Amino acid sequence: ADLANGAKVFSGNCAACHMGGGNVVMANKTLKKEALEQFGMNSEDAIIYQVQHGKNAMPAFAGRLTDEQIQDVAAYVLDQAAKGWAG
């Protein structure tokens, strides 16, 4: 996966709600490592599925992002979560 591309995809499509790994809509459903583990979202496959299909207030991005963009952003989210969203 291309983490630099994932960062661009995140910035352009995800950061409005998930800036710095947070969640402005549902405060407990963050992209922080602990929350990803708690909610079973701590794998690329789980993140890819949610990005493709959406859930609750989160829209589906299948058809809006390519498979490659979705894979890259999933890898970026896991990488940032492992680093504590420190950049």
Curated annotation (Swiss-Prot):
Functions as an electron carrier between membrane-bound cytochrome b6-f and photosystem I in oxygenic photosynthesis. One of its GO terms (biological process) is photosynthesis. Coiled coil: none annotated. GO terms for molecular function: electron transfer activity; heme binding; iron ion binding. GO terms for cellular component: plasma membrane-derived thylakoid lumen. Belongs to the cytochrome c family. PetJ subfamily. Its main location: other. Binds 1 heme c group covalently per subunit. Keywords: Electron transport, Heme, Iron, Metal-binding, Photosynthesis, Thylakoid, Transport. Monomer. Heme c binds at C14, C17, H18, M58. This is Cytochrome c6. InterPro entries: Cyt_c-like_dom (IPR009056), Cyt_c-like_dom_sf (IPR036909), Cyt_C6 (IPR023655), Cyt_C_IC (IPR008168). It is found in: Cellular thylakoid lumen. The keyword Metal-binding applies. The lineage of its organism: Bacteria, Bacillati, Cyanobacteriota, Cyanophyceae, Acaryochloridales. The keyword Plastid does not apply.
